[in-house]
Amino acid sequence: MMVVVDAPIEDTWRALADLPLQTVWMHEMASMTVTTPGPVRVGTRAEAVVRILGISVRDPVEVVELEPPVRYAIRHNGLFRGGGVITLEAGVDGTATIVRWEETLVPPILPELGALIGAPILRSIFQADLHHVARLVASGGVE
């Protein structure tokens, strides 16, 4: 998934790498609690409650890569396993940012079939989230 954000890479990074702020731009995320004290770093753990297709699920995650302001990756350690990587690239003139998001979630039951069926649904949800964060950052609504 990809979106172009009409804002510099530093502003876009601040919004995407702020774990608690994800509840603002990720429609399916009901809550996010960072359980590791201190600033976000590799090894930081958090727990989200997400609603997918009307079902609330705990989603414990761990930050596994952090390269400000260009790369951020998490591992899902709960019922659904997998990982997500968000990469940022400054636009040619520095006033825009290209954001790419790759996410793999494997359900606990019939994992291959569930991932195959669920992937298009989740891709649509996550693409909408990217457009939402792009609008928020571009409008200055996320600090």
Stretches with model-predicted labels:
Residues 12-16, 22, 46, 63, ...:
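Hydrophobic pocket/interface hotspot
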Residues 44-51, 71-78:
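Short beta-strand segments that buttress and anchor functional surface loops
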Residues 75-128, 133:
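Beta-strand/loop substructures that line and gate deep hydrophobic ligand-binding cavities in soluble
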Residues 1-3, 34, 59-65, 83-90:
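Hydrophobic/aromatic beta-strand elements that line small-molecule binding cavities or substrate pockets
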Residues 5, 52-54, 67, 79, ...:
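A generic beta-sheet turn/junction motif
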Residues 1-36, 41, 135-138, 143:
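Hydrophobic ligand-binding cavity/cleft-lining segments
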Residues 51-57, 107-110:
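Short, cysteine-centered beta-strand-loop-beta hairpins and adjacent loop/turn segments enriched
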Residues 9-10, 37-40, 64-69, 87-98:
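A short, structured loop/turn motif at beta-sheet edges
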